[in-house]
Amino acid sequence: MSGTILENLSGRKLSILVTTLLLCQVLCFLLGGLYAPLPAGHVTVLGSLCREDHGRQNDTGFLLYSRGAGACIPVTREEVEQDSTKMANELVHVFQMPLPRDLRDLDYSRWQQNLIGVLQVEFGYDSSSELREPPRELQLTIDMRLAYRNKGDPDNGWKLYAHGVEHRYLDCVSSHVGPTETLYSCDMIPLFELGALHHSFYLLNLRFPLDTPSQMNLQFGHMHDLTLTAIHQNGGFTQIWLLLKTVLFPFVVGIMIWFWRRVHLLQRSPALLEYMLIYLGAALTFLNLPLEYLSLVFEMPYMLLLSDIRQGIFYAMLLTFWLVFAGEHMLIQDAPNKSTIRSRYWKHLSAVVVGCISLFVFDICERGVQLRNPFYSIWAMPLAAKMAMTFIVLAGVSAAIYFLFLCYMIWKVFRNIGDKRTSLPSMSQARRLHYESLIYRFKFLMLATIVCAALTVTGFIMGQRAEGQWDWNDNVAIQPTSAFLTGVYGMWNIYIFALLILYAPSHKQWPTMHHSDETTQSNENIVASAASEEIEFSHLPSDSNPSEISSLTSFTRKVAFD
């Protein structure tokens, strides 16, 4: 058996390969740290108060806007207070995005990919109100209308994008106590999420209808300031991200073809680890495919959901591979039968499968529904929000437990290798040098696996933390840095690229060394061969199972022949 490239590659060539890959890894971090802006940006828009014509409340095509020709005339708070009915069912809160800068109108770019809106509400009660405690889980009914227009359209050329009447629940605290009224400031609430930022300008109209028979919105005093925070992906970050994908995609495809061709040249069926490597490469290729370019031409509101699905498939495959990778090197395979996922790893992988399916269902329940109703949010209902938060926390805890279990498996691998190294002194010097070098290389690869797993789990937990709503009340811009995101993404590609190279079958054929020839080889020749930088590690005679791809996995069944 010729073994793998990891076993047979010369020290000089291996050093060049590792150095090149490490330089590429540093380049990925620098690309995000020096050239890419923050992954996301946000703008805060204070709502303008307008009064609509009587009887047009149910006309969804009637839209009010605050800038441009034909804009509505703003209504002041004093005018509302002086009105006998407080302008009930006539007030519209208008938000026009993006805001102008330096007297110049700005527009959204398709490079910004998506748009999320969250709202902060402030309202007041008269001092004569019977309210004694801050409102908790106070139901607010909102009539929401989202519209858009593009460059070149007239100022009044707004087109309705979505309309819905939704319920939100507010938790508020007292922010100001005055002689005539008490002001309350409420937690931010999710308002809408657009999976595609295809148009240049967006307009949001909010109405808070009052209805006595159904007690709709009657528990509120009167609205004060409404602040909309619009969060978008930064276009500069998207360009760097797509550049990274565009460069990495052909390299991974090419190395997969090369790897699978070498496997099929062998006179045996592919081993389990070889199958897992090609599946992992396929999942990475699907993730690398720069489909985001299509969103620059076509409106694809499902792009966020598709990105989550691609990321989920890759996570599932990567977590599965690490368990199999560590398990195949446990060096305790006493049975000669070929390993299969079902026979050896179903207990370990069942938890991974259940977790990934649960996350997929959770994602479908929110982003799948948002394809038809961008105002829908699983965080809108108190019970659903608590369940979602519990689910996210459990996902983060499960990721940490998985990492600890993987560390335990790799520790067992190291311990088993250490136990079997006691047999090295009884071997011939050539055989001992071969295995010592192989063990050193394998330990380095396992340590690289631990680092990759640690950064992956950290990124996953940070992503789940960003999904939660607990940060909105402090800082809506909390996010991983661009350097971390591009670095981890590059690390996945470099790590899998290296595995496909190092675990590809080596086709070098070495002359058979008989026992008598090996035992009579002089010590001087052995030392001279080991010291040479160009020497290839020869595969010594063994009785290994032909289905194995690494001589290290059969180390425990080797018997010293000295």
Curated annotation (Swiss-Prot):
<keyword id="KW-0472">Membrane</keyword>
<keyword id="KW-0333">Golgi apparatus</keyword>
<feature type="region of interest" description="Disordered">
    <location>
        <begin position="539"/>
        <end position="562"/>
    </location>
</feature>
<dbReference type="InterPro" id="IPR009551">
    <property type="entry name" value="Wntless"/>
</dbReference>
<dbReference type="GO" id="GO:0010008">
    <property type="term" value="C:endosome membrane"/>
</dbReference>
<dbReference type="GO" id="GO:0008587">
    <property type="term" value="P:imaginal disc-derived wing margin morphogenesis"/>
</dbReference>
<keyword id="KW-0256">Endoplasmic reticulum</keyword>
<dbReference type="GO" id="GO:0033157">
    <property type="term" value="P:regulation of intracellular protein transport"/>
</dbReference>
<keyword id="KW-0879">Wnt signaling pathway</keyword>
<dbReference type="InterPro" id="IPR053936">
    <property type="entry name" value="WLS_GOLD"/>
</dbReference>
<keyword id="KW-1133">Transmembrane helix</keyword>
<dbReference type="GO" id="GO:0031594">
    <property type="term" value="C:neuromuscular junction"/>
</dbReference>
<keyword id="KW-0967">Endosome</keyword>
<keyword id="KW-0966">Cell projection</keyword>
<feature type="topological domain" description="Lumenal">
    <location>
        <begin position="366"/>
        <end position="390"/>
    </location>
</feature>
<keyword id="KW-0770">Synapse</keyword>
<dbReference type="GO" id="GO:0061355">
    <property type="term" value="P:Wnt protein secretion"/>
</dbReference>
<dbReference type="Pfam" id="PF06664">
    <property type="entry name" value="WLS-like_TM"/>
</dbReference>
<feature type="topological domain" description="Lumenal">
    <location>
        <begin position="463"/>
        <end position="482"/>
    </location>
</feature>
<dbReference type="GO" id="GO:0042995">
    <property type="term" value="C:cell projection"/>
</dbReference>
<dbReference type="GO" id="GO:0030177">
    <property type="term" value="P:positive regulation of Wnt signaling pathway"/>
</dbReference>
<dbReference type="GO" id="GO:0050714">
    <property type="term" value="P:positive regulation of protein secretion"/>
</dbReference>
<dbReference type="GO" id="GO:0005886">
    <property type="term" value="C:plasma membrane"/>
</dbReference>
<keyword id="KW-0628">Postsynaptic cell membrane</keyword>
<keyword id="KW-1003">Cell membrane</keyword>
<dbReference type="GO" id="GO:0005789">
    <property type="term" value="C:endoplasmic reticulum membrane"/>
</dbReference>
<dbReference type="InterPro" id="IPR047843">
    <property type="entry name" value="WLS-like_TM"/>
</dbReference>
<keyword id="KW-0812">Transmembrane</keyword>
<dbReference type="GO" id="GO:0045211">
    <property type="term" value="C:postsynaptic membrane"/>
</dbReference>
<feature type="transmembrane region" description="Helical; Name=6">
    <location>
        <begin position="391"/>
        <end position="411"/>
    </location>
</feature>
<keyword id="KW-0325">Glycoprotein</keyword>
<dbReference type="GO" id="GO:0000139">
    <property type="term" value="C:Golgi membrane"/>
</dbReference>
<feature type="transmembrane region" description="Helical; Name=8">
    <location>
        <begin position="483"/>
        <end position="503"/>
    </location>
</feature>
<feature type="compositionally biased region" description="Polar residues">
    <location>
        <begin position="541"/>
        <end position="556"/>
    </location>
</feature>
<dbReference type="GO" id="GO:0042734">
    <property type="term" value="C:presynaptic membrane"/>
</dbReference>
<dbReference type="GO" id="GO:0017147">
    <property type="term" value="F:Wnt-protein binding"/>
</dbReference>
<dbReference type="GO" id="GO:0007367">
    <property type="term" value="P:segment polarity determination"/>
</dbReference>
<feature type="transmembrane region" description="Helical; Name=2">
    <location>
        <begin position="240"/>
        <end position="260"/>
    </location>
</feature>
<dbReference type="Pfam" id="PF21883">
    <property type="entry name" value="WLS_GOLD"/>
</dbReference>
<keyword id="KW-0709">Segmentation polarity protein</keyword>
<feature type="topological domain" description="Cytoplasmic">
    <location>
        <begin position="412"/>
        <end position="441"/>
    </location>
</feature>
<comment type="function">
    <text>A segment polarity gene required for wingless (wg)-dependent patterning processes, acting in both wg-sending cells and wg-target cells. In non-neuronal cells wls directs wg secretion. The wls traffic loop encompasses the Golgi, the cell surface, an endocytic compartment and a retrograde route leading back to the Golgi, and involves clathrin-mediated endocytosis and the retromer complex (a conserved protein complex consisting of Vps35 and Vps26). In neuronal cells (the larval motorneuron NMJ), the wg signal moves across the synapse via the release of wls-containing exosome-like vesicles.</text>
</comment>
